[in-house]
Amino acid sequence: MARSLVCLGVIILLSAFSGPGVRGGPMPKLADRKLCADQECSHPISMAVALQDYMAPDCRFLTIHRGQVVYVFSKLKGRGRLFWGGSVQGDYYGDLAARLGYFPSSIVREDQTLKPGKVDVKTDKWDFYCQ
C-alpha cells in the first residue's frame, strides 16, 4: 500500500513537469500580427533595459533580470499587444545564438531605437513554438 502511494506521488510529480511547455511543440498564439523592423524580423527595433525581474511562465517567454539589456525584435499587435519579442544581451553560449522569446513590454524601458518597427508581419506557429 505504501509503495503504491509513493509510485502514485512520483507519477503526479512527473506529470506536473511534463506539460507542453517542457516537452516542446506548438503553443497557443499570443497574437496574429506583429510589428518588426523588416519582413523577417531579423533586425532589432530597439534596445531596452529591464526595470524588474520577470520569470518566464513557459517556453515562449524569456526570463529577464532587472538591469539586463534586452534587444527588441518585434512588438505584438491586437490581443497580444502587451508583449514584445526579443533576446537578452549575453544570453548565449559560445557559438549558439541567443534565445528569442516574449516578455511584457511594461517591464522594460526602451533606451535606444535602432530601426523603426513599422513593418506589419503575420505571425505563424513557429513564432510560438517551444523546443
UniProtKB/Swiss-Prot annotation:
It comes from the Eukaryota. GO terms for molecular function: growth factor activity. Its main location: secreted. May possess two intramolecular disulfide bonds. GO terms for biological process: extracellular matrix organization. CDD domains: MIA. It is found in: Secreted. The keyword Secreted applies. Keywords: Disulfide bond, Growth factor, Secreted, SH3 domain, Signal. It holds the Pfam family SH3_2. The keyword Secreted applies. All malignant melanoma cell lines tested and infrequently in glioma cell lines. Residues 43-113 form the SH3 domain. One of its GO terms (cellular component) is extracellular space. Residues 1-24 form the signal peptide. Disulfide bonds join C36-C41, C59-C130. Elicits growth inhibition on melanoma cells in vitro as well as some other neuroectodermal tumors, including gliomas. Interacts with FASLG. Interacts with TMIGD2. Belongs to the MIA/OTOR family. This is Melanoma-derived growth regulatory protein.
